[in-house]
Amino acid sequence: MRFILVFCLVLVCASPIHAAAPTKSPKPSPISLNIRTAGELANACTVTPTSQAGFAQLNFCNGFAQGVLQTDRQNPNGTKICMPSPSPKRSVTMKEFASWVRADVSRKDEVASVAFLRFMAGRFPCT
């Protein structure tokens, strides 16, 4: 019994420590999102997410929209937007926003947040 214990201890100590070390995968390159205009936001909101950059753009679009709406609601004099119940899917609304931006060339260069609030007020007016 003692021999088996010593043998196992020697076997464990003699085995190479790094034999099964996991391989490190290369770090992905950073994704830069610099969206300022309604046109840039429209592009981000309609990208097909087939890569990390595509997923990042789509996630940015959704987070941007949510952040703009929440911030605007904190302002007592903010934009009057009344969402129906049940609310439409965010992806559908953001595609509508992109179509709205692309329907008028002058909208593409507007500040993204301003254009988004204008779209939302027109799309979901309070009556």
Protein language model features and the residues they cover:
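Compact alpha-helical subdomains of small soluble proteins
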Residues: 70-127
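Sec/Tat signal peptide C-region and signal peptidase I cleavage site
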Residues: 15-21
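Bacterial N-terminal signal peptides
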Residues: 4-14
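N-terminal propeptides/low-complexity segments immediately following signal peptides
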Residues: 23-27
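Short N-proximal segments of mature Sec-exported proteins
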Residues: 28-93
